[in-house]
Amino acid sequence: MNYLAHARRHLLTPGKITGPGAEAGPYFLAGVALPDWLSIIDRKVRTRSESAAKLLSDSDPRVVAVARGIIQHHFDDRWFHQTEEFLVLSSRFAVELRQYLDIEQGAQPGFVGHILVELLLDATLTAEQPDLLDQYYAAMDLLDPECVENVVNRVSKTPTSLVRPLIPRFIRERFLYDYAEDAKLLWRLNHVMKRVGLPQLPESLLNWLPTARERVTHARDGLMSGQHEDPPWDHWSNQSTTSP
């Protein structure tokens, strides 16, 4: 699951992100995004639910919101990756991508198929409600990056100083808008390939992306079937109160 799919339900909840008493709302969105942000800057930095739960009783509501967002992220990923639609689409994409990718040069069609389902789902959700991305970035713009980084360093065993500069760059680049167009999507995908050390994807993929996009749009409801489910907050709150 990618950024907007993680955030969508919370953006649509009146007063959750904006409005009276919602000052911590953007920090929940930051928590929901954090595991994906960390995959960009340093995969050795991990924010696990068990560690985040220890902060649920913190006196700072922003810290609590980030911790809740981290737990929500991992909960969402678990149900999402178990949906029939994700399993079928990612597997089919992996098979079809083999005719475009150079396996002998190290290309990994399974990895590409996996992330394509997630990015194209974000594109589908954006097309449904174009203002959602505007709301998302507006909420992110309210963050204190130092506060978010401090939470990461309390949760992760590996410290980092890279979260603080990443957040304004993430807001400035607004790359989630690029998923709507196949050429821009391919360009963004090749940024990912470079970052993880995989071969660049060929331009011939532009001939295949429209059918992939159409199938993800068709599977949208199944892919989002668990979107209204919540983590077992009582369980995680107990972890907070029993932690030293």
How would you describe each model-predicted region?
Residues 121-130, 169-181, 220-224, 236-244:
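Hydrophobic transmembrane alpha-helix bundles
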Residues 137-225:
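An amphipathic alpha-helical core segment
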